[in-house]
Structure formats: structure tokens, C-alpha cells
């Protein structure tokens, strides 16, 4: 088991602090360009509120991943190319984040927002091993393995479903962030303690994202 040494603690602190710094900057930019949530039946705000906080979280995650993480990882022998591992996820996230930012300003039609999510899902399916390619029936059941075509459709459908589920609950301050932190923390625990082989980079990537989201909370 690879320990979370002091270098990795600094990585997480860096993600947290960077998110704190970027959040007010993104808030000012959002107000200037009109990326705001207008009052409606789903929201409790009575005046337009900046709606691009996710951009601060994403930028904090990306900067931490590309600049701080390699400094920590270089001190340990790890048989994985981290950039090859995470770059497609970042590109997919960039597509979704950009689509969301444009939607915050211009209120895109649903078909265009869906197109952005589908493109991101295809990138992740094509260039990573994050795929819905099997399902283990609990309590001693068999492992069901899916063919490439079904794997493709299930993976894309899963990413679309999760993304839209998050969008649907985005009506109360802190709700999406809280749900995301709980979900990500569960994933981190499972990936570090309960997989047949520890996926350390997956765990650390998830925890970096958690730190970025937590940094968004104080502001």
C-alpha cells in the first residue's frame, strides 16, 4: 500500500488553497460576462447569482494535477504514466466545463448541452479504461462481461446520466458540492481499500478533486 506522505498532503493543500483563490476571481468574471443564475421556480435566490463556480473547481483540479502532482509522484516508483492516465479525463472535463460556461452566458438549447456531454463521454470511453464493461452480481453472483458495442453505449449513458443528475439538483447553495464530496469520498475509499489491486492514482485524483470542491465552500 503506497502511503499518503507529506508531499501528497501538500498537493491536497495546494488544490484547496488554489480553489479558494480562484473562486472570487471567477465570481467577478461571471458577473461581468453575464454567467449568472436568474431567479426561477427551482432556485431560492431572489437576484441573479454567479453560476460558474464549477470553473474555479475545474481550474484548481487541472493546475494541481499538472504542476503539483508530478513533484510528489517523482519521489515514488509508480508504474503508471500519470499524464497519459488523466489527460483524457481533463480534456473531457474541459469540454463539459466550456459547454456549461457558454450555457451560463447564452442559455444553450438542450441538444447542444447534450452534445457537449456526449463528446466528453466518447473521449473518456476511447482513451481511458473508465468503462462500463462488466457488472458483478452481488453475494456470490457471476461476473457479467459486456462486448465493445454495449460497453460503449453503457459508458456514454452512465456519464450522461450522472452529469444530468448533478444538474438537476443544482438549485440550492452547497447541495451539489456536498453530494459530490460524499460520492467522491466513497469512491476514494473503495479504490484505495477494496479493489483487488490498489489504484493509487485514481484515489489521489479523486482526493484532489475533493480538495478543490472543499476550497469552493468557504466562499
Give a label for each model feature:
Residues 2-219:
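"…together with the soluble PPM/PP2C metallo-phosphatase catalytic core" -> "…together
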